[in-house]
Amino acid sequence: MANVYDWFEERLEIQAIAEDVTSKYVPPHVNIFYCLGGITLTCFLIQFATGFAMTFYYKPTVAEAFSSVEYIMNEVNFGWLIRSIHRWSASMMVLMMILHVFRVYLTGGFKKPRELTWVSGVILAVITVSFGVTGYSLPWDQVGYWAVKIVSGVPEAIPVVGVLISDLLRGGSSVGQATLTRYYSAHTFVLPWLIAVFMLFHFLMIRKQGISGPL
């Protein structure tokens, strides 16, 4: 095993990377409230794992979406637990994100030179809410259907481009299969890639600039 480790160490400098990660200075004023961002990340990782597991059984069609969710809940081994954890973790992720935003704002963590970290965090918040909106519709039950109906109809109030935006969200002039397909694609592909990119940027900025000082 030592020879294997030495082989990788020679090429990747694992020890230097580990020392850099573990030796980062943590200011003395940091308390449990500074962990809210990390808890939000943990919730996202749980979301990713449980969501990925459900993609093996979920069917994104208006005819089979609801029955496939019922199948996950009633027939798949531990399916009820996986979906329940997905729902609970989604609520926890939003709650932790809100508390994290409040903590950063109240402690002045958005001030110079951390403006870009704040902006990327706001974008991450928007993406998180978008996850909630798109995921809410996927069971395609009465609640999900009418939620999509309302959400996709809101932009119609915007002058000139409102109808175009609504049609883009729905995939047509009315809510149907195209709408479910778009929401499913956004929830399982587009938004995960977006949040991964902005999370990476967010963490690199924090790593570079460190934790903000006390007020």
From Swiss-Prot:
<feature type="transmembrane region" description="Helical">
    <location>
        <begin position="116"/>
        <end position="136"/>
    </location>
</feature>
<dbReference type="InterPro" id="IPR005797">
    <property type="entry name" value="Cyt_b/b6_N"/>
</dbReference>
<feature type="binding site" description="axial binding residue">
    <location>
        <position position="86"/>
    </location>
    <ligand>
        <name>heme b 2</name>
    </ligand>
</feature>
<feature type="transmembrane region" description="Helical">
    <location>
        <begin position="32"/>
        <end position="52"/>
    </location>
</feature>
<dbReference type="Pfam" id="PF00033">
    <property type="entry name" value="Cytochrome_B"/>
</dbReference>
<feature type="binding site" description="axial binding residue">
    <location>
        <position position="100"/>
    </location>
    <ligand>
        <name>heme b 1</name>
    </ligand>
</feature>
<feature type="binding site" description="axial binding residue">
    <location>
        <position position="202"/>
    </location>
    <ligand>
        <name>heme b 1</name>
    </ligand>
</feature>
<dbReference type="GO" id="GO:0046872">
    <property type="term" value="F:metal ion binding"/>
</dbReference>
<dbReference type="GO" id="GO:0016491">
    <property type="term" value="F:oxidoreductase activity"/>
</dbReference>
<keyword id="KW-0793">Thylakoid</keyword>
<keyword id="KW-0479">Metal-binding</keyword>
<feature type="binding site" description="covalent">
    <location>
        <position position="35"/>
    </location>
    <ligand>
        <name>heme c</name>
    </ligand>
</feature>
<feature type="transmembrane region" description="Helical">
    <location>
        <begin position="186"/>
        <end position="206"/>
    </location>
</feature>
<keyword id="KW-0472">Membrane</keyword>
<dbReference type="GO" id="GO:0022904">
    <property type="term" value="P:respiratory electron transport chain"/>
</dbReference>
<keyword id="KW-0249">Electron transport</keyword>
<keyword id="KW-0812">Transmembrane</keyword>
<keyword id="KW-0408">Iron</keyword>
<keyword id="KW-1133">Transmembrane helix</keyword>
<keyword id="KW-0349">Heme</keyword>
<comment type="subunit">
    <text>The 4 large subunits of the cytochrome b6-f complex are cytochrome b6, subunit IV (17 kDa polypeptide, PetD), cytochrome f and the Rieske protein, while the 4 small subunits are PetG, PetL, PetM and PetN. The complex functions as a dimer.</text>
</comment>
<dbReference type="GO" id="GO:0015979">
    <property type="term" value="P:photosynthesis"/>
</dbReference>
<keyword id="KW-0813">Transport</keyword>
<dbReference type="GO" id="GO:0031676">
    <property type="term" value="C:plasma membrane-derived thylakoid membrane"/>
</dbReference>
<comment type="similarity">
    <text>Belongs to the cytochrome b family. PetB subfamily.</text>
</comment>
<feature type="binding site" description="axial binding residue">
    <location>
        <position position="187"/>
    </location>
    <ligand>
        <name>heme b 2</name>
    </ligand>
</feature>
<dbReference type="InterPro" id="IPR048259">
    <property type="entry name" value="Cytochrome_b_N_euk/bac"/>
</dbReference>
<protein>
    <recommendedName>
        <fullName>Cytochrome b6</fullName>
    </recommendedName>
</protein>
<dbReference type="GO" id="GO:0045158">
    <property type="term" value="F:electron transporter, transferring electrons within cytochrome b6/f complex of photosystem II activity"/>
</dbReference>
<feature type="transmembrane region" description="Helical">
    <location>
        <begin position="90"/>
        <end position="110"/>
    </location>
</feature>
<keyword id="KW-0602">Photosynthesis</keyword>
<dbReference type="InterPro" id="IPR023530">
    <property type="entry name" value="Cyt_B6_PetB"/>
</dbReference>
<comment type="function">
    <text>Component of the cytochrome b6-f complex, which mediates electron transfer between photosystem II (PSII) and photosystem I (PSI), cyclic electron flow around PSI, and state transitions.</text>
</comment>
<dbReference type="InterPro" id="IPR016174">
    <property type="entry name" value="Di-haem_cyt_TM"/>
</dbReference>
<dbReference type="InterPro" id="IPR027387">
    <property type="entry name" value="Cytb/b6-like_sf"/>
</dbReference>
